[in-house]
């Protein structure tokens, strides 16, 4: 710690910080542009000037840039010094000479750091009367709009895109006051994290194009704290709504998880919530048609049919909340509850959970991954299956430069010096996968092989680290030399990290990862292990347990069950569509509860229209076992009284109560959570994931809307001039209104949107943190359900045999895509142009045997259908395998590991 003196007052601060960080952490306001907590200091904009004095007696002082000055013990500075204030105002005036007067039409208006800093410096009159510099804007793809005339040359965008996210297609061109930030030519930004430019940019150069189509100001949107639903990582988000539509998603700061950044799937993939074909009222089949029901009719009709059924089973979902899956389990009984996950995937999920809970190895939070100094990724294409983890891995690799700089006593915020010292130095990263990955550019070595051979590599590494681990026979000398390099790197690391998961389709890969981690722990390393699952609540469903989807289908096929309730699950993704359809056709009652229109609704007798994450509350559990709560953003029935969309748990509990002819006793979310805790002790921690509905701050609920929210009385004027009462939230501590507490100093960690007096942009998160870039002042949201066990597991011994190609047979190797493999975000219209066209990847040798080239169309039979796809040649794919894009174009993820036998060139 250090003692600094600011405008005559004494403060204790972190001596490792610079003065700008220290003052912002104290709650003092200093304007800045080029500095960002995640990017460090370069002193480019000169906006954060303060007056520094030699001692208490010095009255003259000198101007210094606070972002480039250490917060040393005994420092005396003044923020309010007149010369410093005039200098800061003049800097803004210089920046404004070429900045357009377009705040009223700029999409950044009201959410703009430049506006905030201009007001903060007191600059209110422009003296520049000459021609402004102008630029041509670029088309940067479907996600981001580009308006270069608003640029103030702070360099944040390229520092984030190139230095932080390792992007290669955005740069700065030109010189002096005529610089251009963009691509060499028009085209879609290639980085999976390009959307963060929207929040990194302090002006309106980069804005959210998906928001442009249905634009409104930040102060006119309704927000709620939420969790990204598009993968298992559980990033915190702030969805914004207006007129019953999601308009945009912003990053919600969580110092333990995603801190300042999201991936593009999480930021832009929300379009499925706004689809017009979503079920909005319950419907029941009458012959070949469906009739619309109200809620009471739906409950009575379903109850009447279920009473006549001899056995009702329930099929849950890894994309449904803990509460909804539990409500289904209560409806049908624990013994009749099935997870809706394929048997193989469920085995892998249970193994991953076993490793995390009983393996004795620490599981780091997402942000902690950045602190590891050697990383081994076994089997996961992390950028496609858990993209935000990939960004954290990139920071871990860069830690070598910080380590070298620290040895020379260079502060962690001196980013330019760190980059100069580090040059190309990296901590070691080793990646195994069936083919190329997006992390290969920073990897020390990439091993491209079938999953058996990847697992064998992992087992061999574990044995080399600890000879009591099972040995692997038949390792080639060339591969052994690579294993020796990996072992040396992992053994020499202080904090090695092993990453694996369920998406490779191999139990042995997960076992090998666990063995490597155990071997490293035995050598005294502070080792971590991260498992990546498939869906937002895969871990929660795994903890809850239940039978596999195949077992559920068998119950229907044999007639032992004659009614089935399917919860938020497109079963065609987890099993053969032919088998699913045949099994459902045998059931007298098929009830579907979902917020998306799926193929299995064609087999449904009753459809209950569920609420999506934006219209409901619930709990999900991420890949590290962290329970996190998402909250309802808006009530769709407020805008259309005919809409009947309820949380899935509400539908299911209401049906359960109707069946038993009793009053509904789960009248609010807390009642469901209490029931979960009582029945499933392993999930007891979810009660602490967020405060209950009685939580108040000075007697107030928390506001979902900014206090400047406008137009509420006119929203429904086209329907009726009589304004209805605002929706009443009985489930949470939030209110559907601007009336409520929204102060940054209030004792809360569930924050709907970032705003503080004088801070309207995302930089307002500074006001919610215990120190800038640290944790939220009153704790980061969420709670870990399990910590590192004391004992640990024995070594796994099932070393697989080497992969052997078979004549006339090809095994399907899974290829995942950030844009397209996820069940929900692939429905977003904006993603359609980012999704790759369907393909089949072939090794060059296999292509030669078949007599086909790139672009040739080949066909194969699957599930009673003939599938025809164009060939792509994959040099890294081992012969005897074919690569298919999982989750796209009818290619269900369950296909991973299956075999094709009739692959041939398609008839023209």
UniProtKB/Swiss-Prot annotation:
Catalytic activity: a quinone + NADH + 5 H(+)(in) = a quinol + NAD(+) + 4 H(+)(out)
Annotated 4Fe-4S His(Cys)3-ligated-type domain residues: 83-122
GO cellular component term, pick one: oxidoreductase complex
EC number, UniProt record: 7.1.1.-
GO MF annotation, one: NADH dehydrogenase (ubiquinone) activity
Taxonomic superkingdom: Bacteria
Residues reported to bind [2Fe-2S] cluster: 34, 45, 48, 67
Name listed for the protein in its UniProt record: NADH-quinone oxidoreductase subunit G
Enzyme class: translocase
A Gene Ontology BP annotation from the UniProt entry: ATP synthesis coupled electron transport
Residues engaged in binding [4Fe-4S] cluster 1: 99, 103, 106, 112
Keywords from the named record: 2Fe-2S, 4Fe-4S, Iron, Iron-sulfur, Metal-binding, NAD, Quinone, Translocase, Ubiquinone
Binding site for [4Fe-4S] cluster 3: 228, 231, 235, 263
Free-text comment on the cofactor: Binds 1 [2Fe-2S] cluster per subunit.
Domain (2Fe-2S ferredoxin-type): residue spans on this chain: 2-83
Cofactor: [2Fe-2S] cluster; [4Fe-4S] cluster
CDD domains xref list: fer2, MopB_CT_NDH-1_NuoG2-N7, MopB_NDH-1_NuoG2-N7
Domain 4Fe-4S Mo/W bis-MGD-type: 221-277
Disulfide bridge positions per record: none
Binding site for [4Fe-4S] cluster 2: 151, 154, 157, 201
Family assignment from sequence similarity: Belongs to the complex I 75 kDa subunit family.
Keyword NAD among record annotations: yes
Cross-referenced InterPro entries: 2Fe-2S_ferredoxin-like_sf, 2Fe-2S_ferredoxin-type, Asp_de-COase-like_dom_sf, MoPterin_dinucl-bd_dom, Mopterin_OxRdtase, Mopterin_OxRdtase_4Fe-4S_dom, NADH_UbQ_OxRdtase_75kDa_su_CS, NADH_UbQ_OxRdtase_ferredoxin
Subunit organization: Composed of 13 different subunits. Subunits NuoCD, E, F, and G constitute the peripheral sector of the complex.
Protein role: NDH-1 shuttles electrons from NADH, via FMN and iron-sulfur (Fe-S) centers, to quinones in the respiratory chain. The immediate electron acceptor for the enzyme in this species is believed to be ubiquinone. Couples the redox reaction to proton translocation (for every two electrons transferred, four hydrogen ions are translocated across the cytoplasmic membrane), and thus conserves the redox energy in a proton gradient.
């Amino acid at each position: 710690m250090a003692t600094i003196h600011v405008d005559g007052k004494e403060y204790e601060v972190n001596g490792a910080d610079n003065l700008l960080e220290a003052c912002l952490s104290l709650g003092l306001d200093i304007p800045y542009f080029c500095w960002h907590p995640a990017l460090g200091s370069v002193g480019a904009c000169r906006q954060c000037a303060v007056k520094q004095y030699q001692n208490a007696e010095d009255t003259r002082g000198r101007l210094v840039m606070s972002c480039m000055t250490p917060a040393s013990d005994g420092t005396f500075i003044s923020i309010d010094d007149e010369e410093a204030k005039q200098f800061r105002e003049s800097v803004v005036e210089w920046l404004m000479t070429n900045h357009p007067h377009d705040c009223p039409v700029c999409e950044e208006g009201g959410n703009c750091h430049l506006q905030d800093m201009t007001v903060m410096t007191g600059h209110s009159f422009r003296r520049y009367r000459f021609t402004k510099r102008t630029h041509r804007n670029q088309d940067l793809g479907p996600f981001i709009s580009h308006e270069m005339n608003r640029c103030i040359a702070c360099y944040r965008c390229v520092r984030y895109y190139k230095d932080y996210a390792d992007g290669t297609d955005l740069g700065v061109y030109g010189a002096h006051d005529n610089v251009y930030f963009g691509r060499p030519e028009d085209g879609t930004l290639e980085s999976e994290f390009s959307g963060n430019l929207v929040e990194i940019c302090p002006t309106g150069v980069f804005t959210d194009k998906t928001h442009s189509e249905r634009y409104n100001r930040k102060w006119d949107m309704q927000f709620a704290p939420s969790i990204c639903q598009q993968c298992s990582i559980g990033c915190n988000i702030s969805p914004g709504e207006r007129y019953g539509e999601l308009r945009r998603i912003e990053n919600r700061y969580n110092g333990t998880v995603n801190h300042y950044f999201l991936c593009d799937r999480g930021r832009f993939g929300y379009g499925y919530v706004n689809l017009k074909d979503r079920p909005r009222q319950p419907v029941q089949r009458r012959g070949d048609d469906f009739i619309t029901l109200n809620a009471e009719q739906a409950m009575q009709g379903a109850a009447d049919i279920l009473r006549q059924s001899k056995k009702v089973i329930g099929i849950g979902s890894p994309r449904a909340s803990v509460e909804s899956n539990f409500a289904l389990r209560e409806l049908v009984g624990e013994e009749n509850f099935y997870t809706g996950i394929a048997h193989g995937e469920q085995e892998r999920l249970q193994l991953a959970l076993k490793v995390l809970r009983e393996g004795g190895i620490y599981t780091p939070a997402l942000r902690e991954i950045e602190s590891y100094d050697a990383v081994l990724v076994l089997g996961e294409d992390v950028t496609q299956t858990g993209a935000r983890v990939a960004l954290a891995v990139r920071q871990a690799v860069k830690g070598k430069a910080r380590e070298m700089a620290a040895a020379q006593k260079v502060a962690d915020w001196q980013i330019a010096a760190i980059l100069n010292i580090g040059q190309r130095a990296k901590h070691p990263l080793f990646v195994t996968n069936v083919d190329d990955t997006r992390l290969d550019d920073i990897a020390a070595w990439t091993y491209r092989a079938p999953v058996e051979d990847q697992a064998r590599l992992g087992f061999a590494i574990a044995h080399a680290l600890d000879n009591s681990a099972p040995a692997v026979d038949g390792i080639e000398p060339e591969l052994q030399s690579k294993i020796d390099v990996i072992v040396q790197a992992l053994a020499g690391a202080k904090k090695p990290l092993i990453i694996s998961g369920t998406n490779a389709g191999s139990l042995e890969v997960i076992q090998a990862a666990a063995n490597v981690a155990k071997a490293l722990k035995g050598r005294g390393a502070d080792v971590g292990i991260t498992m990546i699952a498939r869906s937002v609540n895969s871990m929660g469903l795994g903890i809850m347990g239940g039978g596999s989807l195949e077992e559920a289908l068998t119950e229907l096929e044999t007639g032992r069950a004659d009614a089935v309730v399917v919860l938020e699950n497109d079963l065609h993704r987890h099993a053969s569509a032919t088998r699913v359809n045949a099994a459902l056709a045998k059931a007298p009652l098929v009830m579907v509860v979902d917020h998306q229109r799926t193929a299995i609704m064609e087999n449904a007798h009753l459809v209950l229209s569920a609420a999506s994450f934006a219209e409901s509350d619930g709990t999900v559990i991420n890949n590290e076992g962290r329970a996190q709560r998402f909250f309802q953003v808006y009530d769709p029935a407020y805008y259309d009284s005919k809409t009947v969309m309820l949380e899935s748990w509400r539908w299911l509990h209401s049906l359960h109560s109707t069946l038993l002819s009793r009053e509904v006793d789960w009248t609010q979310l807390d009642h469901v959570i209490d029931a979960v805790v009582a029945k499933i002790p392993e999930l007891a921690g979810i009660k602490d994931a967020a405060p209950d509905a009685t939580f108040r701050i000075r007697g107030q609920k928390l506001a979902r809307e900014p206090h400047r929210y406008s137009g509420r009385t006119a929203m429904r004027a086209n329907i009726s001039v009589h304004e209805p009462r605002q929706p009443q939230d009985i489930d949470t501590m939030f209110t559907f209104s601007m009336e409520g507490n929204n102060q940054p100093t209030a004792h809360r960690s569930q924050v709907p949107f970032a705003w503080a007096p004088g801070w309207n942009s995302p930089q307002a998160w500074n006001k919610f943190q215990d120190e800038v870039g640290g944790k939220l002042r009153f704790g980061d949201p969420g709670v870990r359900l399990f910590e590192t066990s004391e004992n640990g597991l024995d070594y796994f011994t099932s070393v697989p045999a080497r992969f052997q190609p078979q004549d006339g047979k090809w095994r399907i190797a899974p290829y995942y895509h950030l844009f397209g493999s996820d069940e929900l975000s692939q429905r977003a219209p904006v993603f359609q142009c980012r999704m790759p066209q369907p393909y089949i990847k072939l090794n060059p040798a296999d292509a030669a045997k078949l007599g086909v080239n790139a672009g040739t169309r080949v066909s194969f039979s699957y599930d009673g259908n003939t599938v025809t796809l164009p060939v792509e040649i994959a040099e890294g794919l081992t012969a005897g395998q074919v690569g298919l894009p999982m989750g796209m174009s009818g290619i269900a993820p369950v296909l991973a590991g299956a075999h094709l036998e009739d692959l041939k060139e398609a008839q023209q």
